[in-house]
Amino acid sequence: MLRLFAVLLLALPLRLAAQLPSVSPVMVYAGENGAETEGTDYDGDAPFAATFKACPENVGEYTAIYEWQFTRQGESTPFLRRYEEDTQYTFNQSGSYTVQLLATFVLGADTVQYSQAETGEAFSVAISESKLEVPNAFTPNGDGVNDVFAVKEGYKSIISFKARIFDRWGKKLYEWTDPAGGWDGRSSGGKAPDGAYYLNIEAKGADGKQYNIKKVINLLRGYTDKDSAN
């Protein structure tokens, strides 16, 4: 947790440091297994949703003014400013960003100001370029291996996604809109037979890349790992 030190401007009687308002800004996001995580930096894929909290202390009778600044790497002017104590933002574009808090506390002629820019403790967010690949077949035989048709592990920064499965006559059998999802080889409550099916994926990456994947996939329910060993 970061604690920013105060600059006291136009102070009347000098107040004890312990009595001055302060902030300890944090970035909170969902980490592994969805657990709430606090950190100063993030390097991963989109969409990345984070909550930025000022965590003020000793505000007392001071009037608090907050300004969160979101800036892209290589740019000097923030592309977004927020003016609440806590703010939430979802990063949907690839690239590197800094997020910093400027907090000002005013009481009469007393002004106490905190700036992450001056302390060099701004939050850092890096969003990767997108990646999306799909296999050619799956084997929904209940052996726990390759039982669900899904995009390959390691997909990155996919911000919109829609996949559909059709049979050879063009009937839609299944649809899903989360790249973490997939088709278990069932249709209308029963098992779809072995054979060729048609996959259509429309997706978009955080880097603006469009994915339009149309291909034939094979359902091989009778295939097992023992077959590959022979």
Where are these regions (language model features)?
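Short loop/turn motifs at secondary-structure boundaries
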Residues: 42, 48-56, 123-230
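Surface-exposed, flexible coil segments in extracellular/virion-facing regions
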Residues: 60-89
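Short, solvent-exposed loop/turn segments at the edges of extracellular beta-sandwich modules
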Residues: 104-113, 204-208
